[in-house]
Amino acid sequence: MKKLISIFILSLLFINTKADTHYINSGNFYYSPSSLTVDVNDTVVWLNVQGFHNVNFDISSTTGNSFGNPVSFISSPTGADTMYIHKFTVPGYYEYDCSVGSHAASGMIGNITVNAITDGNGVANGTSLT
């Protein structure tokens, strides 16, 4: 039993637990970068460079259909320097836009891929990825 506990504790050392913070600039009709890949537990900060914007991960402003994201959320429109901060805890592919005026129709759209944390053996959250 001691051997199993030791192996378990050692395996925890190899699990990626480091969380990063990523920044997206928001300006007149753009998010930069517009496409981003992060890991589960990473935080994304949207910075407002210019204008009045939000981040909408719920309903597409151009089609009126749900983005179908693993988790849906929307921030309030703001002109503040920091628009929104979100910690991604659910892996998957997320699409979003700015739902202020016609910003999305003018190209203010983006996507984020959230990768599951793996243990180095292709196992994420107890589920084999292979």
Predicted ranges, named:
Residues 15-19:
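Sec/Tat signal peptide C-region and signal peptidase I cleavage site
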Residues 11-12:
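Repetitive helical segments and hydrophobic/amphipathic motifs
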Residues 126-130:
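A short beta-strand segment in extracellular, disulfide-stabilized domains
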Residues 2-7:
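Sec-dependent signal peptide recognition
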Residues 20-119, 125:
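Extracytoplasmic copper-binding redox domains, predominantly the cupredoxin/blue-copper superfamily
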